[in-house]
Amino acid sequence: MDTHIIEEGLVKIEVPDFEKVSAKAPVFYNPVMEMNRDISVAVINQYRKEVDHDISICDAFGGTGIRGARYSKEIHGVEKVVVGDVNPLAVEISKKNMQLNNISNVEVQKNDANILLQSNKGLFDVVDIDPFGTPAMFTQSTAANIRPGGLICISATDTSALCGTYHDPCLRKYGAKPLKTEYCHENGIRILIAFISRNLAVNQKYLHVLFSHSTEHYMRVYAIVKRGGKKTNKALDNIGFIAHCPNCLHRETTYGFAPKIPHTCPECGGEYDVAGPLWLGKIWDKEFIYNTMELVKNLNLNKKDDLMSLFEKCYMEADGPVTFYDIHKICKKLKISSPKINDVMDEIRNRGYFISRTHFKLTGMRTDMPLDELKQLILDIKEDKLGPEK
């Protein structure tokens, strides 16, 4: 097998030559996920700083070992990293890569992710689940075996299911109905978080989301796991449904597992589409993001600029309402061309409403301004009724 050396972060890794990224490759390595790994290094570093003790990390899908190697080299206060993979070739390459980087605190195991977690119950402070596809079948093992106070880092690449392109796979994997809307990637993350939360609840555990994002072809959630029956029950109150009107774009949220969901839009009389159950609570911790951005300034990351841009956008939208509006979608409904998004945002801000861009969509705005007022504002800007001289 032909190989070559790549450099990422502070490590050098030997990887197999391949024509394209595929789950069928002998050993999986995806260069597109470098930013994913950069974010993970940053978030886990900040987590380690806040817990203020040495940590143990489980990378349950080792591949070439690049994630485990970077965690060892680039995260301060790592006592041990356990890298697992079911592929014997991946295990062999991972071990070579640890030697290549003179790493002694990484243990590489040939093991299924679920078995790896079950055989190390309560031993890991951080569990990283980054499979090719859905993490659904590994979430219960993660929930049952993560140490209380630990950090879970979970990726999903089956975005076609979570975003509503294919409904049945989402129902089958996550027990939720997705919805193909302009904010479908946000819905997808909220479905994923609700699914994780329900799995944790079985073990009287609940989550506090630190950071989440949708980038390229994947979604990623970072959350602290805590324990307690009453607080778990309270955390489940954050799960509910979104009712969306495809006719006028109005939407509303309803909390609970079996709520009375309205069928008709109160604004236009159109029929609602419904998504859920999904997480309606916070999907970002603003203080944690700020502290992580400060920490990133001192890290050696190839994708630092992209990472900081993502953190800044999520920081700005962290206090906003559930879902956002797409200015192009609204203008299409109004049958007008779109004004400059910054002009619209400035006027929303002048009226005292929350307003931010969103990392989910370039043309997206997160605001608590009522939709009918937002539509009229856009029309007024197009008709030049608003402005400093008016």
Curated annotation (Swiss-Prot):
InterPro entries: SAM-dependent_MTases_sf, Trm1, TRM1_arc_bac, tRNA_met_Trm1_C. GO terms for biological process: tRNA N2-guanine methylation. Keywords: Metal-binding, Methyltransferase, RNA-binding, S-adenosyl-L-methionine, Transferase, tRNA processing, tRNA-binding, Zinc. Coiled coil: none annotated. GO terms for molecular function: tRNA (guanine(26)-N2)-dimethyltransferase activity; tRNA binding. Its EC number is 2.1.1.216. Transmembrane segments: none annotated. It holds the Pfam family TRM. Residues 4-378 form the Trm1 methyltransferase domain. Zn(2+) binds at C245, C248, C265, C268. S-adenosyl-L-methionine binds at R37, R67, D85, D112, A113. It catalyses: guanosine(26) in tRNA + 2 S-adenosyl-L-methionine = N(2)-dimethylguanosine(26) in tRNA + 2 S-adenosyl-L-homocysteine + 2 H(+). Dimethylates a single guanine residue at position 26 of a number of tRNAs using S-adenosyl-L-methionine as donor of the methyl groups. Belongs to the class I-like SAM-binding methyltransferase superfamily. Trm1 family. This is tRNA (guanine(26)-N(2))-dimethyltransferase.
